[in-house]
Structures are given as structure tokens and as C-alpha cells.
């Protein structure tokens, strides 16, 4: 996470103690919930899932991205507790670079999930051909490469500097044009464009599902939608504040004015709030698992994701595409293991 974010105010600064308390609480909750939760998801997929579906690979990489950013939380907690940055400039840049990579990887993975579902509904037979693990691995590799590249500005602008007799890890822009560029670049590439693609995908899905009778469409994409909404809820305020800051910078308003100070205070909290987005997904998996959590125990993640790879056959009936899982009755009742991406999709075969 990057752009014009500065580390939360030092506890030794005026009003800093109360300001630092909420970020400390949010970071601690994110670390306590997200670190074991995402580790459990990674362990479940790598150790307990014999045949990993494309969806499982996407979820695995999303959990890895979340783990990466959560591993930086102790450094920020140390800063909040001590009131000064103790990990030199290299630590400053690396911590924020990892946060930037994680943010981009997460939003790109969520976008791919949405596009995958849209393709499966709009072009099910094409989806069957391209939705293979080999192709998915190439896509995932591309996502990580792009994420590393998009986060490079953090390495360029981040530095350690003195502020009120304390060392802070903060951006250092040569001029206001660089600041505006970085703020807008992060908001557009890290949120606006990906979520336009997500909205377009689900608008197309909704339109097509109204015209076609898909099996189990009621459960289609439930968990993916929850993941998208959670990510938007945690990151939209952060990007909105950065856009406001960019506008104020272009207008030449004083950053030390009361409004500018309130904007900085809001950003301190929103940075910590964004960390919670990396801890919420395992909670969503548990909620979406329903009865699986009770029946399958620690294997509920595997059971939840196994449904995303069930084979589906497609036929035309009266001009309408009807998809029926193989080896199941023509009109099966939705079970607890119905996938969150496979309903009305042709899953990966030939893996």
C-alpha cells in the first residue's frame, strides 16, 4: 500500500497516543486472525487437496498474497509502540513494497475470478478449453510479475526521514507532480480499472442468467461476491482519501490546514483498516462452508473447493444451454459443497 501514505503518528507526538491506539488494535486483530487463518488455507490446499482445481489455485495465491502483507504488520506495530522507525531505509522500502505487491496481486486475482465466471457463463465451451491448470499457472505467474512491476513506485518514493525528532517511513516526492502521479496511478491501477472489470463481468453474468436457466444459479459465485465486496469495503475508503489528497495537491491547498490534518488522521486509520482485508477471507470461507465446518472439521476448506472441479456436461434444450454435472441426477438438489465458481460453469478437465 503505498502512495502518499505515511506511517501512523508516533505515540510521542501530541495526540499521538490516542491516534496510534486504533491502528494498533486493527493491526493486532488482522495479525491474530489473518496469519493463522491464511496459513490454514494454504496448508489445506497444499497438503490435503490431492486434485487442485483452478479455483483452488486462485484461492491459494490469494492467501499467499494476504500472508505476505501480514508478515509486515509486526514492523509497523513496532513503530507504533516505539514511536520511531528502527529498520532503516531498506526495511522501510521493502515493507511497503511487499504491501504494494500484495494489494495489486489481491485485486488482480479477484478480477481474474470475476472474468473466469463471466467467461464460463458467456462462453462455456471456450471456458472448458482454456480453464486448465496449465493455463491458470501462466496467468498466475503473469499476475505476480505485473504486481511486482506496478508496486515499483513504492521503492522509488519511500524513504526514512525525521519528523518532530522521530524517524518515520514516509514518501518523499521531488515535487507535487510526482505526488499527484503516484496517488492517481495507485488508485487507477490498484482499484478503479480492476473493479470496472469486476462490475462489467457481473453485470454480464446477471444479464445472461436472466435469459438462461442455469442449474444451481442461486448459489453461483456467492463466495466470490463476498470476497469482492469485502475487498472493496476495506480498500475503497483508502483510495478515496488518496484521490481527495491528489485533488488538494493540484489545487495547491495547504497540507497543514485543519482539513489537511484531518485527512492525514483518516489515512492513518485507513491504512491499518486495509490490513484487515488480508485477514477476512478465511472468515468468509468458514461462513460460506456452512455445515461443512461441522461435518468436515479441519477439512472443510478442501470440501468447499472440491466442488469447483466437478465435471459438467452441457446440452441444448429448446435453444437454452443446460448444464448437468456428470454422474448426478438431471435435477440435483444443491448440496453444501456446491462451488462458488463452478455453478453454471464448465470446470477444468484433463488435469
Curated annotation (Swiss-Prot):
Residues of the signal peptide: none
Disordered: annotated segments: 311-351
InterPro entries named in the record: Formyl_rcpt-rel, GPCR_Rhodpsn, GPCR_Rhodpsn_7TM, Leukotriene_B4_rcpt, Leukotriene_B4_typ-1_rcpt
Residues carrying covalently attached carbohydrate according to the record: 4, 164
Tissue: Highly expressed on activated leukocytes, including eosinophils.
Extracellular compartment residues: 1-21, 78-93, 162-179, 244-268
Keyword Phosphoprotein: yes
Subcellular location: Cell membrane
Domain of life assignment: Eukaryota
A GO CC term attached to the entry: plasma membrane
SUPFAM superfamilies: Family A G protein-coupled receptor-like
Post-translational events: Phosphorylated by GRK6 upon leukotriene B4 binding; which promotes desensitization.
UniProt keyword terms in alphabetical order: Cell membrane, G-protein coupled receptor, Glycoprotein, Membrane, Phosphoprotein, Receptor, Transducer, Transmembrane, Transmembrane helix
Annotated membrane topology: Multi-pass membrane protein
A single GO BP: signal transduction
Topology, Cytoplasmic side: 45-56, 116-140, 201-222, 290-351
Family to which the UniProt record says this protein belongs: Belongs to the G-protein coupled receptor 1 family.
Function per UniProt: Receptor for leukotriene B4, a potent chemoattractant involved in inflammation and immune response.
The protein's name: Leukotriene B4 receptor 1
Organism: Mus musculus
Lineage: Eukaryota, Metazoa, Chordata, Craniata, Vertebrata
Amino acid at each position: 500500500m503505498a502512495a502518499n501514505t505515511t506511517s501512523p503518528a508516533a505515540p510521542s507526538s501530541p495526540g499521538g497516543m490516542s491516534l496510534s491506539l486504533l491502528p494498533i488494535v486493527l493491526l493486532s486483530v488482522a495479525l491474530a486472525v489473518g496469519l493463522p487463518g491464511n496459513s490454514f488455507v494454504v496448508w489445506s490446499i497444499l497438503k490435503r487437496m490431492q486434485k487442485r482445481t483452478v479455483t483452488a489455485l486462485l484461492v491459494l495465491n490469494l492467501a499467499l498474497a494476504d500472508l505476505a502483507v501480514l508478515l509486515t504488520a509486526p514492523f509497523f506495530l513496532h513503530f507504533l509502540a516505539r514511536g520511531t522507525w528502527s529498520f532503516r531505509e531498506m526495511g522501510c522500502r521493502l515493507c511497503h513494497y511487499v504491501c504494494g505487491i500484495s494489494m495489486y496481486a489481491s485485486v488482480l486475482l479477484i478480477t481474474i475470478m470475476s472474468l473466469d465466471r463471466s467467461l464460463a457463463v458467456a462462453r462455456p465451451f471456450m471456458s472448458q478449453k482454456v480453464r486448465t491448470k496449465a493455463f491458470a499457472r501462466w496467468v498466475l505467474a503473469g499476475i505476480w510479475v505485473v504486481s511486482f512491476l506496478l508496486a515499483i513506485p513504492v521503492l522509488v518514493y519511500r524513504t526514512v526521514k525525521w519528523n518532530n525528532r522521530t524517524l518515520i517511513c514516509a514518501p518523499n516526492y521531488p515535487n507535487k507532480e510526482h505526488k499527484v502521479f503516484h496517488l492517481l496511478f495507485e488508485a487507477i491501477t490498484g482499484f478503479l480499472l480492476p473493479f470496472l472489470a469486476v462490475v462489467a463481468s457481473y453485470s454480464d453474468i446477471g444479464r445472461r442468467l436472466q435469459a438462461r436457466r442455469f442449474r444451481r444459479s442461486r448459489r453461483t459465485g456467492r463466495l466470490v461476491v463476498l470476497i469482492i465486496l469485502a475487498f472493496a469495503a476495506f480498500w475503497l475508503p483508502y483510495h478515496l482519501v488518496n484521490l481527495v489528497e491528489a485533488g488538494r495537491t493540484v489545487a495547491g491547498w495547504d497540507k497543514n490546514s485543519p482539513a489537511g490534518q484531518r485527512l492525514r488522521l483518516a489515512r492513518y486509520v485507513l491504512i491499518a483498516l486495509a490490513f484487515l482485508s488480508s485477514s477476512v477471507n478465511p472468515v468468509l470461507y468458514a461462513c460460506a462452508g456452512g455445515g461443512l465446518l461441522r461435518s468436515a472439521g479441519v477439512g472443510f476448506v478442501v470440501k468447499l473447493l472440491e466442488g469447483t472441479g466437478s465435471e459438467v456436461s452441457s446440452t441444448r434444450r429448446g435453444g437454452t444451454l443446460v448444464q448437468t454435472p456428470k454422474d448426478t441426477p438431471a435435477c440435483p438438489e444443491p448440496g453444501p459443497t456446491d462451488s462458488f465458481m463452478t455453478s453454471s460453469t464448465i470446470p477444468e478437465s484433463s488435469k
